């Protein structure tokens, strides 16, 4: 029996954000098609925004976690067993919300003003304050446009082949296995996945 803790990342099947700040894959059509009654606009958090799955931002999050693990104390049990990617596996939520979309795409990179494709975002230097780093990253992101990878849409409930291909694309882009998926709001709609599913 494996008694080591596992580090599991949880992401929606599409990008979301509250309030101001960069959301490179934001799409007004998705906002209209994927309303979230539990995440409306608020005076302190601003509007709830929606975009296509952003593999670049997800990779950045994995790098931040991996960096935290690499710089943690050897006795810090939070980071004793995670993979080099920062987590051992992923759970993707809200996949059912994408059923019936006329097209599916995910951002696999960003294109800068010179036409250069960036597949990752650099971690800020440790000499900068959090505020400085955030300002630089925001400025950098505002100069870019997403590069999209088109995927086949699906309308059937559950895990039809196109939904499985969408999960496989996320796994491929991030280099992390998708171990489970949420296909609805109830516990019965959560599904563990075997490798290759």
Question: Where is each model-derived feature located?
Answer:
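Non-transmembrane, aqueous-exposed alpha-helical and coiled segments at domain scale
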Residues: 1-197
């Amino acid at each position: 029996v494996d008694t080591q803790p596992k580090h599991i990342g949880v992401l929606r099947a599409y990008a979301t954000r509250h309030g101001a700040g960069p959301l490179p894959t934001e799409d007004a059509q998705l906002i209209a098609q994927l309303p979230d009654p539990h995440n409306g606009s608020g005076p302190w958090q601003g509007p709830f925004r929606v975009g296509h799955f952003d593999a670049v931002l997800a990779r950045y999050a994995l790098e931040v976690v991996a960096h935290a693990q690499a710089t943690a104390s050897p006795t810090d049990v939070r980071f004793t067993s995670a993979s080099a990617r920062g987590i051992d596996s992923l759970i993707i939520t809200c996949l059912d919300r994408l059923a019936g979309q006329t097209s599916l795409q995910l951002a696999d990179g960003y294109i800068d003003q010179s036409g250069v494709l960036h597949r990752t975002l650099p971690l800020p230097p440790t000499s900068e304050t959090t505020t400085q780093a955030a300002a630089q990253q925001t400025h950098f992101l505002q100069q870019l446009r997403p590069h999209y990878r088109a995927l086949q849409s699906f309308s059937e409930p559950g895990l039809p082949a196109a939904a499985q291909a969408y999960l496989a694309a996320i796994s491929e882009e991030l280099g992390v296995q998708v171990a489970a998926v949420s296909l609805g709001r109830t516990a019965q709609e959560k599904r563990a996945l075997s490798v290759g599913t």
